């Protein structure tokens, strides 16, 4: 898998012609390869990273600016506006930020910025567009990843039979799993 990840980065550096963003690279893994389970899950995990980047960036933007909003709406002294023990809406906004795992360092940064007179923060947000920075930051996006299945594999799926994953170095069985589980 390490080699595939390196190849994926290299393919990303060499864009194919035309309007598509994908490089002209195809990766095929045999259904009986010892790394087949990891290969299948590789792209799924990378897609989950994109979802986390997108959701996390938008959550940061929202919650950090809610802290600024609580400070701006304060009608008491300016020193007390940034003190959550005196500014109840600020305390609530900070709690909400912590509830969704906004790091303490970012909350402190917003409070420090507010003390300097800033009224909002621009936190970079990402989207799920294929050409977005979020997708560019994960691996497995620069190739057509496919699995080579054989008639014997399909028969094993149909029969709910065991399926052997074969080491390429010596031909021995690395692991036995249910074909349907892999399917």
Regions found by a protein language model. Name each.
Residues 1-183:
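Active-site cavity-forming subdomains of large catalytic enzyme subunits
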């Amino acid at each position: 898998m390490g080699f595939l990840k390196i190849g994926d980065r290299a393919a990303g550096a060499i864009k194919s012609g035309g309007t598509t963003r994908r490089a002209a690279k195809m990766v095929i893994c045999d259904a009986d390869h010892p790394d087949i389970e990891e290969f299948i899950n590789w792209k799924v995990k990378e897609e989950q990273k994109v979802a986390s980047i997108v959701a996390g960036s938008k959550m940061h933007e929202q919650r950090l600016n809610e802290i600024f909003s609580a400070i701006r709406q304060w009608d008491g002294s300016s020193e007390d506006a940034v003190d959550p023990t005196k500014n109840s809406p600020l305390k609530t906004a900070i709690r909400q930020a912590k509830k969704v795992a906004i790091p303490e360092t970012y909350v402190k940064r917003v409070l420090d910025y507010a003390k300097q007179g800033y009224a909002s923060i621009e936190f970079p947000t990402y989207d799920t567009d294929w050409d977005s920075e979020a997708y560019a930051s994960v691996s497995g996006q620069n190739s057509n990843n496919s699995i080579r299945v054989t008639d014997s594999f399909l028969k094993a799926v149909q029969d709910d039979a065991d399926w052997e994953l074969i080491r390429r170095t010596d031909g021995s069985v690395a692991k036995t799993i249910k074909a349907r589980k892999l399917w």
